[in-house]
Amino acid sequence: MKQEINPKDSPRGFAFELWKTAGMPKVTIFKTFDITRLIKVAKRSGMKTNMLMCWCIGKAASPIEEFYTLPAGGHLWQYDRLAVNTVVKTANGPVHLCDIPFSEDIHQFNEDYLRLTRQVRDTNEDHLLGDEYMAVDTSTLVECEIDGVASVYSELFTNPFLAWGRYRRGLFKTTLPISFQFHHAQMDGFEAARFLNGLQETVNGLTIR
């Protein structure tokens, strides 16, 4: 459930006052991930690579307190649940957004991912969870190799945002550059680095039981 909190009563109070009126309050960090393990799990399990990456993102974000607060509209909001948003390309061309509620149970998350992305494709309508969840936004540009995306900001969309392109196969490992953009009133570089390191650890330890 979403509720407004007083920034002064939050650990983010100073950062909120410092960054709430900044012209560009978002920071982008680029990191190259070793996703060799994730690709192997996808092949063995038959699960989609993008679904596995989205689950790993939710898993890495879930223990970090800052992911449950979000600055928007000059206010600071607190949530108690997370979702991962993915972009769905529909049959007639336009893309739509799809929020998938994060679950520690990867099988439940996979079921929701398949059901909801199929719903978006069939209806040509966004599926957004609204005020119930803080969504971590993602975008995948598999048509080309990119290092990431920067300078994506709107006062209407202050959510953390990860973007990546086609993964890169090497002789011994497969890598994927990812950009992570976050609102500086939501978190600092320390929390962002903790999340990115946690994402690599989650990918490394990925198993399907």
Task: Enumerate the predicted regions with their spans.
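Acyl-group handling in specialized metabolite and lipid biosynthesis
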Residues: 27-30, 38-44, 93-107, 187
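Domain-scale detector for complete catalytic domains at protein termini or as standalone homologs
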Residues: 1-16, 20-24, 37-41, 58, ...
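Core mixed alpha/beta domains of very large multi-subunit molecular machines
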Residues: 149-151
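Histidine-centered acyl-transfer/condensation active-site motif
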Residues: 130-143, 160-197
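Helical lid/core segments from catalytic subdomains that handle acyl or acyl-like groups
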Residues: 90-146
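Gly/Ser/Thr-rich phosphate-binding loops and adjoining beta-strand/alpha-helix segments
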Residues: 5-8, 20-52, 68-84, 136-138, ...
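Acyl activation and transfer enzymes in specialized metabolism, enriched
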Residues: 38-63, 176-195
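Active-site loop/lid in soluble adenylation, ligation, and acyl-transfer enzymes
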Residues: 52-54, 58-70, 76, 93, ...
